[in-house]
């Protein structure tokens, strides 16, 4: 199985691990992030590992930029088969101590960016099918007051994925969420495990709309 994946919100943890996992299968990988300073070293690392990798600077909170970025990645790869939304603001803070600006900024990334990416991916896959993946979180089902904005975002995207999955499936588009119920550091076993979960979701349609990492014992 070969293909091409765009990872929106690529970082040194789950994003890079997923890029390496898909790259090992011969997939073309496009990383998208807001900062070239963080993006360029990741792309260089992938190329050094023999992965056909590209990078594009992209702000997921800008719907026009996301639409353009997805179409650019589609052209770069000769046809995307999967789009992953991986961006998040991880803020350990309760709702009542956050400023209005912090709430708005976190919602823009944790929710709106995901909506923008899902809409853009659907527009590309509408005529040929494809897979849309979302990096979710255990806070979506087990919330904690100290991670108010992150839990809100993960719950919203999980809800959206579950709601969209049946309709999109009838049009040849799969959408699924990897619910990550653990902390993940760069180059960690957890990052590798989440990447494997994402690969399973992309390559095995029988996994349904959600898969949790780590799997319950």
Language model: regions and residue ranges:
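Conserved glycine-rich cofactor-binding loop
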Residues: 11-12
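Rossmann-fold cofactor-recognition segment
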Residues: 46-64
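Amphipathic alpha-helical dimer-interface segment in Rossmann-like NAD(P)H-dependent oxidoreductases
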Residues: 75, 109-127
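Catalytic Tyr-X3-Lys loop
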Residues: 89, 96-115, 157
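Catalytic loop of short-chain dehydrogenase/reductase
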Residues: 106, 131-156, 169, 184
């Amino acid at each position: 199985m070969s293909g091409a994946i765009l990872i929106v919100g690529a970082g040194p943890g789950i994003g890079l691990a997923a890029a390496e996992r898909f790259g090992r299968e011969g997939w073309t990988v496009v990383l998208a992030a807001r900062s070239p300073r963080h993006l360029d070293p990741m792309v260089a690392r992938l190329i050094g590992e023999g992965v056909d990798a590209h990078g594009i600077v992209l702000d997921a909170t800008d719907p026009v930029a996301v639409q353009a970025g997805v179409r650019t990645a589609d052209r770069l790869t000769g046809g995307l088969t999967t789009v992953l939304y991986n961006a998040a603001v991880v803020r350990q803070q309760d709702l009542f101590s956050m400023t209005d600006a912090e709430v708005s900024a976190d919602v823009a990334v944790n929710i709106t960016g995901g909506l923008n990416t899902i809409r853009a991916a659907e527009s590309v896959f509408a005529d040929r099918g494809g897979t849309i993946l979302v990096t979710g979180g255990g806070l979506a089902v087990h919330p904690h007051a100290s991670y108010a904005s992150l839990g809100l975002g993960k719950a919203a995207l999980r809800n959206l994925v579950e709601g969209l999955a049946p309709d999109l499936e009838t049009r040849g588009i799969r959408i699924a969420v990897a619910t990550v119920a653990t902390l993940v550091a760069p180059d960690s076993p957890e990052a590798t495990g989440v990447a494997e979960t994402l690969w399973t979701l992309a390559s095995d349609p029988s996994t349904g709309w959600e898969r949790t990492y780590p799997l319950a014992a």
